[in-house]
A protein has these predicted regions:
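Long, charged amphipathic helices and adjacent flexible linkers at domain junctions
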Residues: 16-28, 90, 94, 214-223
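Tryptophan-anchored aromatic micro-motifs
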Residues: 217-238, 245-253, 259
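Polyanionic/metal-chelating signatures
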Residues: 1-65, 195, 201, 207
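Structural motif
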Residues: 40-43, 64-67, 134, 227-230
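Active-site-adjacent beta->alpha loops and helix N-cap segments on the catalytic face
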Residues: 68-79
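C-terminal cap of metal-dependent C-N hydrolases
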Residues: 185-217
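His/Asp/Glu-enriched, well-ordered alpha-helical/loop segment
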Residues: 36, 82-191
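Glycine-enriched alpha-helix->loop->beta-strand junction motifs that scaffold or abut catalytic
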Residues: 54-60, 77-84, 126-128
Length: 269
């Protein structure tokens, strides 16, 4: 009701009523109507309410969703909105105690099971969406929850699009960011594997062309096969490197060895 009244007041103020004089709040409201507008709805039904009031006053909102839109995905499609989708999933129900388990509803258990499929439902329905760290108990959960969403059907290509092109397009700044093209800001990551592989690490982060080292690629942690030439013949070892100063060699005997590293050259001792 308050939002609707503000829209009506702003429309009235456009007529420049003499009795009102200068109203900086309504003037600013009218001046900013051309900007992208985000409505934090956080629920499937609130999404539809936000869209209805937007339709009433000619505004296409960008809607910040919740985690239950998969339950009414056709209605979400009908809004023609771009959504901002969080990756915050409900915690598992505590059913260890049979007395507590009696009060856990089937709806809650189904939502716990299906919430990670929310983003995949948007992709399947052809609804444009971005991904956000909003609502997470810790931003450190983002990659774990993102990988879980991919296990539930969200494609790698759509993830990249939802983190880059779609946000930039939605905010009207795709001419500056959102892809690696000549003339755009050089904002990108370099990893030692697939960005979505839990074992991969971010090595460099480029921000507007400036390089920031996250993990130096000179660190050679890993497992290696080594052949040593000796007068009695070749000896084969497996090297397990876990730190920058020590290595374990496995062969006929297990040896704890120290090593030093100079760039790409390693010396064992």
């Amino acid at each position: 009701a308050l939002l609707r009244q503000t829209f009506l007041d702003a429309q009235w103020y456009k007529t420049k009523p003499a009795a009102e004089g200068l109203n900086l709040s309504l003037q600013s409201w009218n001046d900013n109507q051309g900007l992208p507008q985000i409505f934090e709805a956080n629920d499937k039904w609130n999404n539809l309410r936000a869209d209805r009031i937007g339709d009433e006053f000619g505004v296409q909102y960008i809607i910040k969703s919740g985690e239950n839109e998969y339950q009414r995905i056709k209605e979400m499609k009908s809004t023609n909105a771009t959504f901002i989708v969080p990756l915050n999933y409900p915690a598992a129900q505590d059913v260890e105690d049979p007395n507590d388990a009696r009060f856990v509803s089937l709806n809650d258990m189904k939502h716990w099971e299906l919430a990670p499929a929310n983003a995949a439902a948007f992709e399947k329905a052809g609804i444009p969406f971005c991904l956000t760290t909003a609502d997470l108990r810790s931003v450190n959960q983002f990659w774990t929850n993102l990988r879980k969403a991919m296990e539930y059907g969200l494609s790698e290509n759509k993830v990249l699009e939802a983190l880059t092109k779609t946000p930039a397009t939605t905010l009207g700044i795709y001419d500056k960011v959102g892809s690696l093209d000549a003339g755009k800001w050089a904002n990108f990551l370099i990893t030692n594997g697939s960005l979505f592989d839990a074992k991969s690490a971010i090595q460099y982060n480029y921000v507007q062309g400036n390089k920031y080292v996250i993990k130096d690629d000179n660190f050679i942690a890993g497992t290696y096969n080594v052949t040593i030439n000796t007068p009695s013949g070749d000896e084969k070892y497996t090297l397990d490197v876990k730190s920058t100063s020590s290595v374990t060699m496995f062969g006929k005997d297990t040896l704890n060895t120290k090593f030093s590293q100079d760039g790409k050259v390693v010396k064992l001792s």
